[in-house]
């Protein structure tokens, strides 16, 4: 799926992309590829001379592979963004490309940070001025989202601590406490990455 956004009076305006022709007519500041199809990848190549990285390229942990200028002069950045769900927390890899004053983003899952930024930028005039503002605000929003998730984990651990300090703890209660601690440690592990 492709979400394209134009900047109008300092606000993001979403343009529904249903065909290559519609994408070609837009004047985007941001094009967000959410689990793109092969056809959508081809549109990126044909319209923007942009070869979208494969998911295999996302996981490279070498510092030189996380941020670099490619052969076309585009800035390529690889990052992880937090996805905090009821089932637990995990990182989702995201690739960014800054080219021709457009931010291209590529990820395989919908991320709350992206939704939150889109909502803010639609409703607050002057919120963004260019693709650089957009990229920086995505990182700032991710830091805010991660901090909220971390606060939730610590609140859970505090509640677990209060339960364990009761005078009597049955074996069943102790098992629940240990399971809760393990779940929260998993969340802390993902938040720390």
Residues covered by each model-derived region:
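Extended amphipathic alpha-helical scaffolding segments in membrane-proximal extra-membrane regions
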Residues: 80-193
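Helix-boundary and N-terminal cytosolic regulatory elements
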Residues: 1-126, 154-156
């Amino acid at each position: 799926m492709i979400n394209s956004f134009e900047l109008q009076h300092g606000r993001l305006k979403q343009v529904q992309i249903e065909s290559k022709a519609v994408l070609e007519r837009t004047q985007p500041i941001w094009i967000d590829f959410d689990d793109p199809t092969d056809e959508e990848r081809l549109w990126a190549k044909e319209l923007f001379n942009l070869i979208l990285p494969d998911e295999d390229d996302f996981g490279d942990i070498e510092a030189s592979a996380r941020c670099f200028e490619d052969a076309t002069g585009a800035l390529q950045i690889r990052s992880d963004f937090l996805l905090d769900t009821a089932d637990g927390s995990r990182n989702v890899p995201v690739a960014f490309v800054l080219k021709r004053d457009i931010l291209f983003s590529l990820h395989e899952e919908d991320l709350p940070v992206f939704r939150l930024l889109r909502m803010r930028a639609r409703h607050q005039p002057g919120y963004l001025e260019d693709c650089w503002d957009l990229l920086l605000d995505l990182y700032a929003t991710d830091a805010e989202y991660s901090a909220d998730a971390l606060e939730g984990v610590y609140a859970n651990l505090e509640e677990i601590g209060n339960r364990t300090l009761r005078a009597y703890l049955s074996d069943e209660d102790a098992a629940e406490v240990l399971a809760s601690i393990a779940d929260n440690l998993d969340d802390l592990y993902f938040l720390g990455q």
